[in-house]
């Protein structure tokens, strides 16, 4: 069987899952995938590799390769490597990203570019899958086209002309081969082909006269929804993926009294269990978003940080949602039983392994509370598996539609874009009764949530501040449910007893109540830090909660200036924005203090919802408007004074708008075309003078 090397670089498991899918399908087409995480450098050697290489690479942070790929990227970026170092290598790469972020798929692009520079050649076009619109829109056709590309590679390299049988098996894949980065989402949905992991043609479900006779007259009265389809989908024969092979055996055993630790859900970083020493509401009660500041007491730990760092908060799922699942799965009376997980002896899943995020011994309630991301949007493979555990034929048909090729648009609209989760599906399809093992196979790890440090350890020794908006939204899949963010909702509830209301932050000790504790862990180092040279000018752009790291910056600068009264400190610009001056102007008093004492030299604040009277050119509604108004100064700081620009906050709109504003400013002030201005900004990023902390 023809071997290829298959490497994945993953941050949250997405790239790994896709690589495993490729590995499972490979056998069908006469290939053998040698599957490894890119961090397992002792198990492969690109310098001597003769087989083709297939890579699946995700993107994290500000367009960075995932943590698992850091050593790999560092190794291939070694400037001493000759330009023909990998000239023998042939590869295909699938990049995963989110176009809401400025540096889309940059993790894959960085590796792709460097492989090219070292002489490696593509045997298959690079794919760029966009999580903003649905990874599957590129992932599925990219995988389908991979087999024909591999076949062509082996034929051309080894001169095999006796592979007609294998070519026949690969022919249906070649018909669907596309250039993924050119795939137009809206017009190319029909290109998707869902093949099963066993390699047979996708199963076709014929809906006969029973379906059409009983439903057609009624269905026209409905609009399409999560639970109902309309023609032509409701009358179509469906191409659905075959059932993913089950591979986990789960037994619930009587508990023996062992204690569980939150640390068991974190496998890499050290975990610190620290008390909350203060909690303050930073916004008025009538503000559109409620923002809280939390102070942690880290004085009895060796946790250290510097302004600009971020850290993880280990959070649980909502207790009410966990209890719903226990009741719905008919396991409420066994919530304290211990979960024992093993690999099924007869599983067909290649490389089946126990999920690392499931502790060896934990209770069922602990598992659902601390280990599984029960809010995750179900992938199509999960829907396919759920369909086989759904008793009602109409409900089963609808789940099959949602995971089918024909139902791709419905899946995007009613599952993906609606943010439907397992609880929503179980409410929508009452006859669906999945076994616990299925949840462990398909639900990802509950990830810790990252937050920016909003303080300086020089200014607040032994303390760590962070701020957040309490996320609230309506789940409107089948019934309207008000939900809070997994972590922000939990934190808000946790600090209720000690929360200081708006404008009462000066009462340092807060309410006399038992201080709650939370578990935190450090995040890998980043470059979102103040310049080493304090004389270098900086521009900070942080609307809303994005101001958090800059409070730490300014606190740090204030202490440095106190320690070095004769020192030279560069100009500091802060572009802050909020909706209303009187409702959500975060840290107003602190910013005025920094301005008064000279730590902050320029403060520009924009209010997007306030109506200003008497301003000739109208108020600056957003931070990008304020940047444009100070175009010459901004360009001077960046291009003449070798300054830094920091952007923190919303990736979906703000970061893009600020990026575009900076391009326009550079173009206008230097008299160059926008393409050249974009190159200049890219150079600033490479020099780590244009830094982003966006989410």
UniProtKB/Swiss-Prot annotation:
Cofactor: FAD; FMN
UniProt main location, coarse: cytoplasm
UniProt subcellular location: Cytoplasm
Enzyme superclass (EC): oxidoreductase
Protein's name according to its UniProt entry: Methionine synthase reductase
Cited InterPro entries: CysJ-like_FAD-binding, FAD-bd_FR_type, Flavdoxin-like, Flavodoxin/NO_synth, Flavoprot_Pyr_Nucl_cyt_Rdtase, Flavoprotein-like_sf, FNR_nucleotide-bd, NADPH_Cyt_P450_Rdtase_alpha
Region (Hinge): 166-245
Record: residues binding FAD: 449-452, 485-488, 695
Residues in FAD-binding FR-type domain copies: 269-531
Organism taxonomic ancestry: Eukaryota, Metazoa, Chordata, Craniata, Vertebrata
One annotated GO molecular function: oxidoreductase activity, acting on metal ions, NAD or NADP as acceptor
EC number: 1.16.1.8
């Amino acid at each position: 069987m023809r071997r290829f090397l298959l490497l994945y670089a993953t941050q949250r498991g997405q790239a790994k899952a896709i690589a495993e899918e490729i590995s499972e399908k490979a056998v069908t087409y006469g290939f053998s995938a040698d599957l490894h995480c890119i961090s397992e450098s002792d198990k492969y050697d690109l310098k001597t590799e003769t087989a083709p290489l297939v890579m699946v690479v995700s993107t994290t942070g500000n367009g960075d390769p995932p943590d698992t790929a850091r050593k790999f990227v560092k190794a291939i970026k070694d400037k001493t490597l000759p330009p023909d170092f990998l000239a023998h290598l042939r590869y295909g790469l699938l990049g995963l990203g989110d176009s809401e972020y400025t540096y889309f798929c940059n993790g894959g692009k960085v590796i792709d570019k460097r492989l090219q520079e070292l002489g490696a050649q593509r045997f298959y076009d690079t794919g760029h899958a966009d999580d903003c619109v649905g990874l599957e829109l590129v992932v599925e056709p990219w995988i389908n086209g991979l087999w024909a590309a591999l076949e062509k590679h082996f034929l051309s390299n080894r001169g095999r002309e006796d592979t007609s049988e294998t070519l026949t098996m690969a022919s249906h894949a070649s018909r669907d081969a596309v250039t993924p980065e050119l795939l137009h989402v809206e017009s190319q949905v029909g290109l998707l082909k869902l093949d099963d992991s066993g390699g047979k043609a996708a199963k076709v479900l014929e809906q006969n006269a029973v379906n059409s006779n009983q439903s057609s007259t009624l269905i026209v009265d409905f609009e399409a929804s999560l639970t109902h389809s309309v023609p032509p989908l409701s009358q179509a024969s469906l191409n659905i993926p075959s059932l993913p092979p089950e591979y986990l055996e789960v037994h619930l055993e009587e508990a023996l009294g062992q204690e569980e630790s939150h640390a068991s859900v974190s496998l890499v970083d050290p975990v610190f269990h620290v008390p909350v020493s203060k909690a303050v509401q930073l916004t008025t009660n009538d503000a559109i978003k409620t923002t809280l500041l939390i102070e942690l007491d880290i004085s009895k730990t060796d946790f250290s940080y510097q302004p600009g760092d971020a850290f993880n908060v280990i959070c649980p799922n909502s207790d009410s949602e966990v209890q719903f699942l226990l009741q719905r799965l008919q396991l409420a009376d066994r919530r304290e039983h211990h979960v024992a997980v093993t690999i099924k002896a007869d599983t067909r899943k290649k490389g089946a392994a126990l999920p690392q995020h499931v502790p060896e011994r934990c209770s069922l309630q602990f598992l659902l509370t601390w280990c599984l991301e029960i809010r995750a949007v179900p992938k199509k493979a999960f829907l396919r598996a759920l369909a086989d555990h759904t008793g009602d034929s109409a409900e089963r048909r609808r789940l099959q539609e949602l995971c089918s090729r024909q139902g791709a648009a419905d899946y995007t609209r009613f599952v993906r874009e609606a943010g439907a989760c397992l609880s929503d599906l179980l409410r929508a399809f009452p006859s669906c009764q999945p076994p616990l093992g299925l949840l462990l196979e398909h639900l990802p790890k509950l990830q810790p949530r990252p937050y920016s440090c909003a303080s300086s350890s020089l200014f607040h020794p032994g303390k760590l501040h962070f701020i957040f908006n309490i996320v609230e939204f309506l789940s409107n899949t089948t019934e309207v449910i008000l939900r809070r963010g997994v972590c922000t909702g939990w934190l808000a509830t946790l600090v209720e007893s000690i929360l200081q209301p708006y404008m009462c932050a000066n009462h340092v000790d807060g309410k006399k109540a038992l201080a709650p504790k939370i578990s935190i862990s450090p995040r890998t180092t980043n470059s979102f830090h103040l310049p080493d040279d304090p004389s270098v000018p900086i521009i900070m752009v942080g609307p809303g909660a994005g101001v958090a790291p800059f409070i730490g910056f300014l606190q740090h600068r204030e202490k440095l200036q106190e320690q070095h009264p004769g020192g030279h400190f560069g100009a500091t610009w802060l572009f802050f924005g909020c909706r209303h001056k009187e409702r959500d102007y975060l840290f107003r008093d602190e910013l005025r203090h920094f301005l008064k004492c000279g730590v902050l030299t320029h403060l520009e604040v924009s209010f997007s919802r306030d109506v200003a009277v008497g301003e000739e050119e109208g108020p600056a509604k957003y931070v990008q408007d304020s940047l444009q108004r100070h175009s010459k100064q901004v360009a001077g700081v960046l291009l003449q004074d070798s300054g830094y620009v920091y952007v923190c906050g919303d990736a979906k709109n703000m970061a893009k708008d600020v990026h575009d504003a900076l391009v326009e400013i550079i173009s206008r002030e230097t008299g160059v075309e926008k393409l050249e201005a974009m190159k200049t900004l890219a150079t600033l990023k490479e020099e780590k003078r244009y830094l982003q902390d966006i989410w």
